[in-house]
């Protein structure tokens, strides 16, 4: 399990995005996904990022195969939840309501987006009443 959401830099997040999409990947595959045809320095950069992510608990390494295969140790939804809660804690005293209000106001939500949000609120209301 990851220590804290703030441990993930934007560059590390780009590596996690590849792993979320691929499920598992080698250093070479991640480097190719991020940089196209890779030079040794890019390969080394990806290895360093994976080492940092592993130390932080965000990725796992399978050493039983060669080359080693990496997989995400945190799901995208979990990281999103943690980051949003951290933002709510930092700016809104832990309340999600002001954060969500700010996110939704002034956005050009489609009719479908608004309907999905209404359905989610209805679902949450039903869960809360049972």
Residue spans for each PLM region:
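Short, cationic-aromatic polyanion-contact patches
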Residues: 9, 64-83
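Short capping segments at the starts of secondary-structure elements
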Residues: 18-26
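Amphipathic alpha-helical dimerization/coiled-coil segments
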Residues: 79-127
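Short beta-strand "wing" residues that participate in macromolecule-binding interfaces
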Residues: 61
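Short, hydrophobic-biased segments on the C-terminal half of alpha helices
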Residues: 47-51
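Short alpha-helical segments that sit at the start of domains
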Residues: 1-18, 78-79
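Short acidic, hydrophobic short linear motifs in intrinsically disordered regions
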Residues: 25-34
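Glycine-centered, phosphate/nucleic-acid-interacting loop/turn motifs that mediate DNA/RNA or nucleotide
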Residues: 57
């Amino acid at each position: 399990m990851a220590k804290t959401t703030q441990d993930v830099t934007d560059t590390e997040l780009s590596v996690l995005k590849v792993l979320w999409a691929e499920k598992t990947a080698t250093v070479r595959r991640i480097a190719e996904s991020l940089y196209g045809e890779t030079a040794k320095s890019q390969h080394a950069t990806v290895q360093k990022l994976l080492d940092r992510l592993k130390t932080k608990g965000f990725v796992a390494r399978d050493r039983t195969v060669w080359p080693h295969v990496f997989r995400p140790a945190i799901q995208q939804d979990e990281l999103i939840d943690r980051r949003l809660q951290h933002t709510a804690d930092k700016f809104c005293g832990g309340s999600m309501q002001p954060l969500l209000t700010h996110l939704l106001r002034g956005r050009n939500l489609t009719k479908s987006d608004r309907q999905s949000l209404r359905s989610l609120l209805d679902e949450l209301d039903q869960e809360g009443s049972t």
